[in-house]
Design a protein with these regions (language model features):
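Rhodanese-like catalytic fold shared by cysteine-dependent sulfurtransferases
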Residues: 2-12, 19-54, 58-101
């Protein structure tokens, strides 16, 4: 995934964790919409509903629930970041820090 981010070919990456979790470190280029606000903010996700979207949270539960919301909103290609943020950190992969975009 990091290679695709660096090459500019990554799909939309959606972080559904809290604001403080996102600010502490997130996948570079991720869009931040906290899970509990997703139903009201799903229209903020740019691109056609047919485009792929990769969702993650800290360990998985919020991301899986977000996937249900996204599919109900018409997103057809929802996948999950393997291992979510926990595995990303354990692997020592580069993180961006700071507020939501």
């Amino acid at each position: 995934m990091l290679a695709r981010i660096d090459a500019g070919t990554a799909p939309t990456i959606l972080d559904v964790r809290s604001r403080w979790e996102f600010a502490a470190g997130h996948v570079p280029g991720a869009v931040h919409i906290p899970f509990w606000t997703l139903p009201a903010r799903v229209t903020e996700i740019s691109g056609p509903r047919a485009d792929p979207i990769v969702v993650y949270c800290g360990h998985g539960p919020r991301a899986y629930a977000a996937g249900i919301v996204l599919r109900a909103a018409g997103f057809r290609h929802v996948t999950y970041l393997e291992g979510h943020m926990q595995k990303w950190r354990q692997a020592g992969l580069r993180q961006a820090v700071g507020g939501s975009r």
